[in-house]
Every structure is written in C-alpha cells, then in structure tokens.
A protein has these predicted regions:
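Gly/Pro-enriched, hydrophobic low-complexity segments
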Residues: 60-68, 113-165
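Flexible, processing/modification-adjacent segments and terminal tails
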Residues: 23-37, 82-134
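Sec-dependent bacterial lipoprotein signal peptides
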Residues: 1-17
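Short, hydrophobic/proline-enriched secondary-structure or compact coil segments at domain edges
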Residues: 37-39, 80-81, 145-151
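An acidic-aromatic
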Residues: 51-105, 151-157
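N-terminal leader/targeting segments and the immediate start of mature chains
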Residues: 14-58, 66-68, 88-95, 110, ...
Length: 165
C-alpha cells in the first residue's frame, strides 16, 4: 500500500512539474511593459468604443468619435474636467472621467500584488483568470494577451490587441 501511495505521489509531482503554466503575474502582465495598440469596448449603460495605446511611458486613451479633436489635452479647473484642443472644449462628466481613470488603471496593474490565478476554459478557450483587490483580468493562455478587464464596476472587452515590433 505504501508503495502504491509513493508511486502516486511521484506521478502527481511529475504532472505538476511538467505543466506549462506561467511563472506568475509578472509573465502574465508582460504585455504592459512594451508598446501596444488596443481596440476595446467599455461596457455599461452607455458603451464606449476606445482605442488604447502605449508609446514609451504614455498610455493614450481615445474614445471613438474624438478623432476630429487632434492633439487634445485634459484640463482641470474649478468647473470640472475638460478635453481641449485649440478653441474646442468638451466638458467631461465626473462619471466619464472616473471611467477613463479606471481604463488607465486596467493597463497599469501591479504584478507584485497578491494575485489569485485560476485556469478556465469558457467556450473551449484556455484562459487565466487573475484576481486581486477588485481587479480581474482574463488573459489568453496561448498568446498571453488580455481579453477582458473588470475593475471598479467597469468591464472592458478587448476586441484587438497588438504589440509593437
């Protein structure tokens, strides 16, 4: 009986060691370290299509329909927050600003925090579901690219994600 148990323990150890599972969140969040371009939809009462990119240290979030504004800047004053370019000023509602900040946070997740990583297969697609401090990121197990984010009551579905060369 002891031999069977020992054999079973050795076999299980072999299976665990041979699994192709990433080292941890540092590897799973590696896409955050380089330049990328992403198309996503922020769900909610009013879904917003977004283009999100990283160039160097900057993360640029452009809502669909804002292309005509060109080089825009966020301006904060006593009346609130605005997106401005030249003479064009568009007031951002508090909820819109909070939603954009949540999107930014989704692309600057901290791999050093304690994460709970589980493997799932919804619809036959292998993914890693990673949860920490109210943030959840779903990562494709084959490409190690993000598929969906959830944070602060917001859901961001990634439609397209490309790493820069």
């Amino acid at each position: 009986m002891k031999k069977v148990f020992c054999l079973l323990v050795v076999f299980c150890s072999f299976l665990l060691c041979s699994c192709d599972v990433p080292q941890g969140m540092r590897e799973l969040l590696a896409y955050q370290g380089g330049d990328f371009a992403c198309e996503a939809v922020l769900s909610g009462e009013k879904p917003i299509a977004l283009t999100i990119s990283r160039v160097g240290d900057e993360i640029i979030i452009k809502p669909e329909g804002m292309e005509h504004i060109g080089d825009a800047a966020f301006v904060f004053d006593e009346e609130g927050a605005w997106i401005c370019s030249g003479k064009t000023r568009i007031k951002l509602e508090k909820t819109q600003l909070q939603r954009l900040c949540t999107v930014y946070e989704m692309f600057t997740l901290d791999s050093a925090k304690a994460w709970r990583i589980t493997e799932e297969k919804p619809g036959g697609i292998e993914i890693y579901k990673c949860e920490s401090d109210g943030n959840t990121v779903y990562i494709d197990a084959n490409t190690l690219l993000p598929l969906r984010f959830s944070a602060g009551g917001e859901e961001l579905d990634v439609k397209k994600f490309e790493m820069a060369e």
